[in-house]
Each structure stands twice: as C-alpha cells, then as structure tokens.
C-alpha cells in the first residue's frame, strides 16, 4: 500500500470516529463535532468548556462527575453523549439563574460545606435531584443520596 493510500485510510477512519451531536445543556442547544469514544464528561469539559463538572476517577466510583439528565443524577464519566441526545442535561453552570446563586449554593456556602470544592458541584447537583422528589428529606435520606459522591477533605460531614 502506498503512503498516499495509508493517509487516505487514516483520514477516512478519523472522519468516521467523529460525530455531530446535538445536546441540550442548561436549557441551551449545543451542536458539537466530537470523537465517538469521548464520554459526556470529556465533551462537557473539553469541547464545551463547562469545567464545573469535575474529572475524578473515570471509573464511576467517586461521583465527582455527577450531572443531571432529565433531573436524575448520572455519572458523566460512564455515559456517552450520544446516549443523552434529546434529553435535558444540567451541569453546575446551570444551577444559578441570572447570576443569582441557587438556594442550595447559598446554603452550602453559609454552612461551610465546601473546603477544597472539588466534590461540591456533584453534591449540589445530587442534592437538587433529591429535593425535586423529596422537599423535606431527613438526615439519613440526605446522607444516602450524597453517599455516591466522595469528599476527600471530609466536607461532607457538614
């Protein structure tokens, strides 16, 4: 095979490894050309520059990458963006409205529930999902809901 033929095959493969996605994120529609192997987390952070969602373990163990898909917490490191086309994706960037922090953000800040802040976006998104289905959860329910997000500096104990 000639060098030109090899380059053509490589170029052809690269084209096939990209896809156009239409994603609804924080109430806005985004069209993005991205690699088919990228996770939702990678597309959010690398292609759309929504870096509030944190990159932790890539194994679904730490919970740092939690976002809401149609109101449900989902680990963005374990899902391909093609799987959530047509669904509403909410990241931490969409929690505040018109520059006004969401009441959960205010409560977290007032209670000192953040030290390094790495787990905070995931905890906030998970807490939001919990409060959508249970507006008055007891402390055990809150602990259980947040248990999927690990905090390395123990800010979760607050």
Model-based region annotation:
Residues 1-7:
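Intrinsically disordered, low-complexity proline-rich regions
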Residues 13-158:
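Signature of N-terminal electron-transfer/Fe-S-associated modules in redox systems
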């Amino acid at each position: 095979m000639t060098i030109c033929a090899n380059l053509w095959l490589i170029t052809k493969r690269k084209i096939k490894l990209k896809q156009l996605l239409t994603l609804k994120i924080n109430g806005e529609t985004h069209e993005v050309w991205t690699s088919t192997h990228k996770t939702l987390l990678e597309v959010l952070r690398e292609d759309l520059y929504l870096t509030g969602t944190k990159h932790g373990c890539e194994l679904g163990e730490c919970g740092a990458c939690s976002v809401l898909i149609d109101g449900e917490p989902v680990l963005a490191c374990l899902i391909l963006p093609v799987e959530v086309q047509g669904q509403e994706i909410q990241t931490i960037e969409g929690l505040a409205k018109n520059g006004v922090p969401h009441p959960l953000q205010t409560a977290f800040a007032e209670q000192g529930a953040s030290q390094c802040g790495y787990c905070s976006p995931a905890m906030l998104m998970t807490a939001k999902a919990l409060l959508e289905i249970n507006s008055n959860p007891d402390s055990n329910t809150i602990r259980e809901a947040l248990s999927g997000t690990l905090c390395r500096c123990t800010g979760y104990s607050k």
